[in-house]
Amino acid sequence: MAGHSKWANTKHRKAAQDSKRGKIFTKIIRELVTAARLGGGDPGSNPRLRAAIDKALSNNMTRDTLNRAIARGVGGDDDTNMETIIYEGYGPGGTAVMVECLSDNRNRTVSEVRHAFTKTGGNLGTDGSVSYLFTKKGVISYAPGLDEDTVMNAALEAGADDVVTYDDGAIDVFTPWETFGDVKDALDAAGLKAESAEVSMIPSTKADMDAETAPKLMRLIDMLEDCDDVQEVYHNGEISDEVAELL
């Protein structure tokens, strides 16, 4: 299947993301602690923890750091009572946006999230307003250069739902989120090194961004990601290579 890969769509944001690495690590550690506290320290029986571990490794976190975070969660050493909150809304150009948060103060979190939407011309919606457009799936991404048939055969044999190859040669393997870890292990065992692996919310439809709406969407995403309580931002905005070059 042809199209624009996440690889192409996010290249222009890499420098900005690198500058946020410290904040990204803090958020991943928070997710590791929470996942271990709620579901135990065994990633084999805790899909949420397994997803957090793979995200940590994709972001070059050391095993020592992530193991300490898991131990904190299992041991209950962190007494902060964090809860997962999902906010839904509409961004620039009619984009559907889901914001996943971990918070110990709902009032603070919703205020910060609403401010980001308002400042960028969007608006915070009600529960269910856009979530029906997204499906929770595992996504294992490979950089351009791998043989498509090799990846596809290994992925489908391992239980993947779909394999998508993009114009630039990048490949995404989509899995049921519950078996994400098993599929990732099978692909690793086949010698296929992933560029990233995570559980994500995949949109069923895309909203094309133009030169006017794309910068506004990027600003919304940046403002949300700058919020300490925000763990993930999912959206259905599609930015073409031509528009991305202008950002």
Swiss-Prot record:
> Which locations, inside or outside the cell, does it occupy?
Cytoplasm
**Could you tell me which InterPro entries the record lists for this protein?**
Integrase-like_N, TACO1_YebC-like_2nd/3rd_dom, TACO1_YebC_N, Transcrip_reg_TACO1-like, Transcrip_reg_TACO1-like_dom3, YebC-like
The UniProt GO MF terms for this protein read: DNA binding
What's an example Gene Ontology biological process for this entry?
regulation of DNA-templated transcription
Keywords from the named record: Cytoplasm, DNA-binding, Transcription, Transcription regulation
Gene Ontology cellular-component terms listed: cytosol
Concerning its family, UniProt says: Belongs to the TACO1 family.
Please list every transmembrane segment annotated in the UniProt record, as residue ranges. Answer: none
Return the protein name: Probable transcriptional regulatory protein ECA2494
Upper lineage: Bacteria, Pseudomonadati, Pseudomonadota, Gammaproteobacteria, Enterobacterales
